[in-house]
C-alpha cells in the first residue's frame, strides 16, 4: 500500500487566517507566473481561499483565467510561483492534489459509444474504486444530478444541459473537497442554467469549496460570496460580492420621463456636475449620480422639479456587477 506523504510545510508569511475562524486557506496561490514563449499569460497572481468559500473568477478571453485554473488543476506547470491545495504543492504532489479537487473544464468531451453509467463507471475505475464502492458512488452522483432515470442513455443523445450534469457528476465522483469549475453553465438554455445553479448551491451548502468562472457576472453574484477579477494576467480586484456592488462609489441610476421638450432635461444635466447623462431617450433620459444617502434620490427629483424640469415618471435601477467590472478595468 502506497504511503501518502504529509502536506508540505507552508511558510508562515504565506498563510492568511480568518479573523473569526482561525482556519488556514485550503487554496493558497503565491506570485504565480506562466509564460508561453514571449507571452506572459499569468503575471504575479496571489490569493487565498478559505474552506467552504464560493469564489467567482472573472476575466475576459485572454485574461489568464483559464490558464490559472488549469495550473490549479495540475494540468499545466507554473513558470514560477506556487499553488498549494489542501496543504499539498501542485507541482510536488500532483496525485494528492487530484484526490482533493474536482476539475470541470469548459469543454465537455463526449464518448458516443458509452452510456451515462458506463462513462461514470470508467472514471470510477480510474480513481481506483472497488466494485461495490464504485456502484454506490455512481448511484449517489446520478441521484444528485438527476441522471438516474436515464442511466442507460447513450452520451451522444444527451442535451447540452444533461451533458453538463454528467460532467459535474464525473467531477464529484471521488467526493473532492475543492471544485474548480471553468464556465460550467456556458451554452446552457435558461432552464438548464437555473437547474445548474441550484446544484451549485446544494454543493455549497454541503461545505464544498467552489472556485467557479463565468462571463455572466450577475449569476456569480447570486452564487458567490467572494469575487476575483483578473485582467492581462494580474488580479485587479479581490473582495466580497456585496462590496463589489459599491466599487467606485454608490451610484444611483434612474430613468426619467418628462413632459414637453426632453432637451430641457439634457440641458439641466449639463448644468449639474454631480449628475451624469447615460443615454438620451424619446421622452427623457437615463441619468446617474453618486450618493450613499437614502434621501438622495428624492432630493435630486425635487431639485429637478424646482429647476423647471417637469418629471412625469422615473425608475431606479440597481448598480450591476458588470458596471463595477468595467469601472475596475478602466482604472487598471
Stretches found by the model and what they are:
Residues 98, 142, 245, 325-326:
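Conserved protein kinase catalytic domain
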Residues 1-33, 331-332:
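ABC-family P-loop ATPase nucleotide-binding domain
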Residues 197-290:
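ABC transporter nucleotide-binding domain
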Residues 24-29, 34-232, 236-237:
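ABC transporter nucleotide-binding domains
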Amino acid at each position: 500500500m502506497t504511503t501518502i506523504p504529509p502536506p508540505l510545510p507552508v511558510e508562515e508569511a504565506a498563510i492568511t487566517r480568518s479573523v473569526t475562524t482561525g482556519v488556514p486557506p485550503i487554496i493558497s496561490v503565491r506570485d504565480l507566473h506562466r509564460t508561453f514563449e514571449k507571452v506572459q499569460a499569468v503575471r504575479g497572481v496571489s490569493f487565498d481561499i478559505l474552506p467552504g468559500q464560493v469564489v467567482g473568477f472573472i476575466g475576459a478571453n485572454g485574461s489568464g483565467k483559464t490558464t490559472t485554473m488549469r495550473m490549479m488543476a495540475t494540468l499545466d506547470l507554473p513558470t514560477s510561483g506556487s499553488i498549494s491545495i489542501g496543504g499539498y504543492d501542485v507541482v510536488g504532489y500532483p496525485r494528492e492534489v487530484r484526490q482533493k479537487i474536482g476539475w470541470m473544464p469548459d469543454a465537455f468531451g463526449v464518448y458516443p459509444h458509452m452510456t451515462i453509467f458506463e462513462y461514470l463507471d470508467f472514471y470510477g475505475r480510474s480513481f481506483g474504486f472497488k466494485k461495490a464502492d464504485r456502484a454506490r458512488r455512481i448511484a449517489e452522483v446520478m441521484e444528485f444530478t438527476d441522471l438516474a432515470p436515464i442511466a442507460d442513455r447513450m452520451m451522444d443523445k444527451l442535451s447540452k444541459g444533461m451533458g453538463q450534469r454528467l460532467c459535474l457528476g464525473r467531477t464529484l465522483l471521488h467526493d473532492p473537497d475543492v471544485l474548480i469549475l471553468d464556465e460550467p453553465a456556458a451554452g446552457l438554455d435558461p432552464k438548464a442554467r437555473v437547474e445548474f445553479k441550484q446544484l451549485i448551491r446544494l454543493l455549497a451548502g454541503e461545505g464544498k469549496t467552489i472556485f467557479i468562472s463565468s462571463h455572466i457576472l450577475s449569476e456569480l453574484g447570486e452564487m458567490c460570496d467572494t469575487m476575483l477579477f483578473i485582467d492581462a494576467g494580474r488580479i485587479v480586484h479581490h473582495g466580497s460580492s456585496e462590496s463589489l456592488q459599491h466599487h467606485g462609489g454608490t451610484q444611483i441610476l434612474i430613468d426619467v420621463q418628462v413632459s414637453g421638450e426632453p432637451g430641457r432635461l439634457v440641458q439641466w444635466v449639463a448644468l449639474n456636475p454631480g449628475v451624469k447623462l447615460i443615454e438620451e431617450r424619446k421622452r427623457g433620459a437615463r441619468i446617474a449620480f453618486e450618493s450613499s444617502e437614502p434621501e438622495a434620490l428624492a432630493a435630486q427629483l425635487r431639485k429637478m422639479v424646482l429647476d423647471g424640469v417637469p418629471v412625469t415618471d422615473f425608475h431606479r435601477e440597481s448598480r450591476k456587477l458588470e458596471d463595477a467590472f468595467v469601472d475596475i478595468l478602466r482604472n487598471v
